[in-house]
Each structure stands twice: as structure tokens, then as C-alpha cells.
């Protein structure tokens, strides 16, 4: 099972691949795009410059370094586009193909069809924004040349396994670290960049300096009174992803599994849900289910955080391959504490069982 790591600068490539990543993915937010459509209408669903390569020159360096390691690199073009945006999107596609990017991560049905018709040999990976919740949707994307599907966060592992079994000749990915939002990517219209617009320096400066991840880490150690203010929305955060939602279990009768799912959804709407969610404990099930790769979220995260994430997963997968681990969950939690310096917060991906 492969490890897919995010990359936002050529200098990260060697470090991440040597740490154990098998594949990288990235996005480009060029000056031409920002000038015409602004950051908020990002071509790859990441509005922050800190999450992106600046231009095609940087992309070329990332591709060259990745290929020098014998690894592969995927370019994200996974937003939904207006007609006037298509020329710049297709220009970036042509530039990426000229640089020999290995695959394009896409979600827009119009773009998927266009790429399949114009570039039938190009590997298309359907983003989680493509909302692939069942085997029929997989068959639909297969008809347009999809080679890989990124499965939504909202699926249970048993559902993933059934979908994979129905299409054994396709590759599938699932998220395992960071950004465990329970909103459905392809349907959600929340704007992640609102706080940056309303409270510019407070949010832009840390991102530009690569310190935003460190600030989020600090939330674990703030007094409970301040943490309550964060949850209540009384600090300058305007992202709808971080409001304090009421989540109700409507299952009748309520079950342990449904209560666990409801709690997991509620816990996911917080600032810490941007950095802490994890599925390390479920790696054995994901591996047994036939998953091609596990994906680390966080193109905007500091390089040190990305590196630590790769080291964490590589160590667990290597241990899993030895068949000598008697209590994998306990080992995963022990490694989490050792590498990250704090205990597992139990913000779990695919938390359909009581812990």
C-alpha cells in the first residue's frame, strides 16, 4: 500500500521521498490565475498561496526531482470551473503534460470529459470532489478513462472494500491523516478563505511564513476557557467549517455505532480537526480491503509536519508487513505519541466503531 504525500515546494521532494513517501501530489496557483480569478477561486481547492507551487517553473523542478527518485507526481486540478476559467485550466494541463506529470487529479465532469477526448492516454485520478460513494459512480468515471478514484471521507471501510472488490482493475486511495472534515467535498460550498479576507494579517502572515501549522499545534495547550471561546466562535474565525454545530443521532433505535459516528462528526468541526484526524489504527483493514494508497492531507502544512506524517505512516506500514505485531492499535498510538509529542486525540477517520 502506497503513501501519498503533499508537496508545495521543490525543496520538499527529496525529504519526503527519502522519508518513505511513494507518490507526491501538488497544485499550482499561478500569478496569471490569481490576477484574473483571485486566490479564493483557486484552480485546485486550496486558496492559500502557502499550499501551492507558484508557477510552472517550480512544477518542473518538482517533477524532475520526483522522477529522479523513481517516484510519481500528481497535479491537482480538482475544482469546479466556469467557462471563462477553462482556457487557463487547459493551459496548465498542457504545461503539466509537457513536463511529464504522471497524473491529473480532477473533479469537474466537464473537464474530465474534455481531457478524456483530447488526451486519452493521460492518467486521470478522480478527486474526492467527484463524490464516488458507490460502484455505479466508479463505473461512470471509468467510462471517461479514470485510472484511480480518491474515496470520500464519509465512507465506512466496509463500504470502501465493497467498492474496491467490484472494480479490481482500478486503483483507489483513501485519506488517513489531517483535515477530517465531515462535509462532502463535492457538495460543500463553504469558503475556506473568508477569515483571510476579513482578518488579513492575523491569518495571511502565519501562512506566508509557514507557521500556521505551529499555531494550530498550540491550540492543544491553551486554557480551557480560551478553547471554549474558539469552539463558540468568539475569536476571529469566519470559516463555516469551524463553527460549533449541534449534531444529533437520528437513528432509531440509537446504536453504539451510530452514537460513535455522531460524536465523530461533531468533533470534526473544529480548528484541531485540520491537523489531528487520523486513521492509523485502521491501516490493517485498509490494506486488507485492497486499497492502493493512503493519502496525507496538508499541502499547506509546514515541511516538518509533512515529514513527520510520512515517517509515522512508513513505520506503521513497515511494521504491518512483518506480521509480528500483536496489538497494532496500541503500537500506532504509542508511535503517535513518540513522534508528535502528545497523545492521540481520538479524532478518527472512519470512526464507525467504539474505541
Predicted region positions:
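Active-site pocket-lining/capping segments in soluble small-molecule metabolic enzymes
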Residues: 1-130, 150, 157-295, 299-355
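Conserved nucleotide-cofactor-binding alpha/beta core module
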Residues: 134-136
Amino acid at each position: 500500500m502506497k503513501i501519498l504525500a503533499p508537496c508545495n515546494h521543490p525543496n520538499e521532494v527529496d525529504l519526503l521521498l527519502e522519508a518513505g513517501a511513494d507518490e507526491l501530489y501538488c497544485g499550482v496557483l499561478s500569478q496569471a490565475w490569481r490576477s484574473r480569478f483571485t486566490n479564493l477561486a483557486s484552480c485546485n481547492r486550496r486558496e492559500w498561496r502557502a499550499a501551492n507551487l507558484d508557477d510552472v517553473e517550480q512544477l518542473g523542478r518538482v517533477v524532475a526531482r520526483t522522477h529522479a527518485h523513481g517516484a510519481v507526481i500528481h497535479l491537482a486540478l480538482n475544482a469546479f470551473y466556469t467557462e471563462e476559467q477553462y482556457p487557463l485550466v487547459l493551459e496548465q494541463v498542457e504545461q503539466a503534460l509537457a513536463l511529464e506529470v504522471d497524473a491529473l487529479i480532477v473533479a469537474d465532469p466537464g473537464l474530465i470529459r474534455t481531457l478524456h477526448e483530447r488526451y486519452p492516454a493521460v492518467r486521470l485520478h478522480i478527486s474526492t470532489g467527484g463524490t464516488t460513494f458507490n460502484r455505479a459512480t466508479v463505473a461512470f468515471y471509468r467510462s471517461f478513462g479514470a485510472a484511480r478514484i480518491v474515496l470520500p471521507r464519509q465512507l465506512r471501510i466496509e463500504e470502501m472494500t465493497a467498492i474496491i472488490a467490484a472494480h479490481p482493475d482500478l486503483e483507489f486511495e483513501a485519506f488517513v491523516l489531517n483535515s477530517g472534515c465531515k462535509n462532502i467535498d463535492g457538495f460543500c460550498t463553504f469558503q475556506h478563505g473568508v477569515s483571510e479576507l476579513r482578518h488579513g494579517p492575523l491569518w495571511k502572515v502565519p501562512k506566508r511564513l509557514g507557521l500556521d501549522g505551529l499555531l494550530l499545534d498550540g491550540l492543544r495547550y491553551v486554557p480551557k476557557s480560551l478553547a471554549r471561546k474558539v469552539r463558540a466562535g468568539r475569536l476571529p474565525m469566519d470559516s463555516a467549517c469551524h463553527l460549533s454545530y449541534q449534531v444529533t443521532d437520528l437513528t432509531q433505535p440509537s446504536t453504539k455505532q451510530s452514537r460513535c459516528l455522531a460524536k465523530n462528526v461533531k468533533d470534526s468541526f473544529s480548528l484541531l480537526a485540520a491537523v489531528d484526524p487520523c486513521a492509523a489504527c485502521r491501516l490493517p483493514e485498509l490494506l486488507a480491503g485492497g486499497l492502493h494508497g493512503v493519502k496525507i492531507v496538508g499541502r499547506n502544512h509546514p515541511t516538518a509536519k509533512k515529514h513527520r506524517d510520512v515517517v509515522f505512516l512508513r513505520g506503521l506500514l513497515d511494521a504491518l508487513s512483518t506480521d509480528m505485531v500483536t496489538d497494532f492499535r496500541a503500537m500506532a498510538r504509542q508511535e503517535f505519541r513518540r513522534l508528535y509529542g502528545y497523545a492521540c486525540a481520538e479524532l478518527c477517520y472512519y470512526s464507525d466503531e467504539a474505541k
